[in-house]
Amino acid sequence: MNEKVLKTLEYNKILNQLSEYACSPEAKKRCLALRPITDKAQIEQLQLQTKDALSRLFRCGNLSFSGVHSVNDSLKRLEIGASLSAAELLSICSLLEAAKRVKAFSRSEKEEVPDDSLTGFFTEIEPLTPLYDEIKRCILAEDEIADDASSTLRSIRRSMRGMNDRIRAQMNNMINNSTTRSYLQDAVITMRDGRYCLPVKAEAKSQIPGMVHDQSSSGSTLFIEPMAVVNLNNEYKELLLKEKDEIEKILENLSRLTANFSEQIAADYTILAELDFIFAKAAYAQTYNGVAPTFNNEGYLHIKK
């Protein structure tokens, strides 16, 4: 079937419609790349997969493949011993969550049914629940590591909270002093370069001994770290560095753990993308009440309007 015939049949329009039923970029790409095939055995195998997927949709309801995306770049980095970022690890978790959901779908039959052409795909999916749980235990968001990710991190952050309270108490005492307050643009505590500062009027700079870390665009306000809290700020800064080092260790440990399952993660992605592609065809058939045609060996095609 040449391109002229496909154009007459508005084949690309059909493919665009089909691709809307796929979730993952890979499955969408495969939908758009579909071309007619002539091998009868291959046709019948693909038709059987679509038929079995459609039967599962009728029996179990819709199946979502959200979260199915390639993590190949991250897996390649793991191969060379690199440490993944929190965002990369959460991305892998998103894929494993999809694997868990799709695996559960295959087990949601109310009655035992015979194996079909898709059983092998579902059987080979491994959600890696222990790995998923460990990553989610340690990483709350792309920019947030849980206090309990390690006992060391928990201890560091407890010290940070205590130091923060001491610094704020000292600076609040200064703000609450009527004389000191008269030298401030605002009675607030601000952060500059990771240091606690007070917004001091430029003309009153000499009245608040300390280190200038910044100034306003107009130059009327200087952000000064009072000498009274310099040592406390130094200790807090050291704790921040310790926190950063510990977070890097946590991510390194999680990366090493994830690297142990790289092959299975890659396999999960391949299977999920394939199932996404198959179920997209089934969902499309369901929407338009499609039926499987009967094929012949003569290459004869009869299209009914």
Where are these regions (language model features)?
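Alpha-helical coupling/stalk and coiled-coil linker elements that connect catalytic or binding modules
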Residues: 1-62, 80-83, 100, 112-117, ...
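Extended, well-ordered alpha-helical scaffold/bundle regions in very large, multi-domain proteins
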Residues: 121-124
